[in-house]
Amino acid sequence: PSHSYYSENAIFFSSYIQDKLEYESFIMNVGIRYDLFDPQSSHVDSLLNPENSLIKSSKKAMWSPRIGVAYPITDEGILHFSYGHFYQMPTMRNLFLKNIFGAGLSPTIGYSDLKPQKTVMYEFGMQQQLSRFLAINGSIFYKDIRDLLALQTINYNSPTYGPSSYSIYLNKDYSMVKGVTLSLTKRRDPNTKMSAFLDYSYQTTEGNSISSGSFYFNALTGQEEEKKIVPLSWDQSHVFNSTVSITEPGINGWGISFIGKLSTG
């Protein structure tokens, strides 16, 4: 059996400010978030000589601006746009997994100087009220995702054990997501006592990735993986969500709900 062990005292800090600005012709939500991560740890000085000295890992400071604008085009229709930056830190295991080297070993080690995954998202859409209880919404979106983790195998010449190899996660991959979402919202009405929300999304997710045999080839030769733009394994082209509720309010009220999801990919 295998196990992971690490004992670290990393520091996380975050704060944000947000404001809503209402004008005669449009409404704007603006904000900014600040995140700070200090691993308070050390990482290998040279990837080609991992058994040598360690150096202190750097602090990561992240500013995330976000903006949303709603522009009424009729009494019952709204155009909306949003833009934002989002960050996600790697798991503690990928940051702090202990370095264990030895004869015949090919360990996966942590790298506490990893950068956070960064997503920049754009969305543009329209919402239209069809009746007192019914509304539709359509939007298109695009996500640019950088600094995804890629598992790298590195061959090196150990001064103690001779030819050796190890694996490490590095910020090397990226992906892009493009898609469209259509939704229908029905508010509860006294006649049917039913409320519902239905939405359908179509998206494509592509990024740089390695072929299924590249990792083994790399472990034998020490060559860099050959990367190309391909559909990613976690892509879901079609996603349909539905929530339907029937309720009767009051002291002796009751309610029943149905939730469903269908997806491909």
How should these model regions be labeled?
Residues 141-144, 155-156, 161-264:
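Gram-negative outer-membrane beta-barrel transporters
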Residues 17-25, 36, 63, 71-75, ...:
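Outer-membrane beta-barrel strand-turn architecture
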Residues 11-17, 63-67, 110, 120-124, ...:
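Hydrophobic, lipid-facing positions within transmembrane beta-strands of outer-membrane proteins
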Residues 25-28, 76-79, 132-136, 191-196, ...:
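Repeated loop/turn-to-beta-strand initiation elements of outer-membrane beta-barrel proteins
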Residues 38-47, 71, 75-121, 142-167, ...:
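Surface-exposed extracellular loop regions of Gram-negative outer-membrane beta-barrel proteins
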Residues 2-5, 47-56, 107-112, 165-171, ...:
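Extracellular loop and loop/strand-boundary signature of outer-membrane beta-barrel proteins
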Residues 1-74, 100:
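Signature of Gram-negative outer-membrane beta-barrel scaffolds
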Residues 15-21, 32, 67-71, 124-128, ...:
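Residues on the lipid-exposed face of transmembrane beta-strands in outer-membrane beta-barrel proteins
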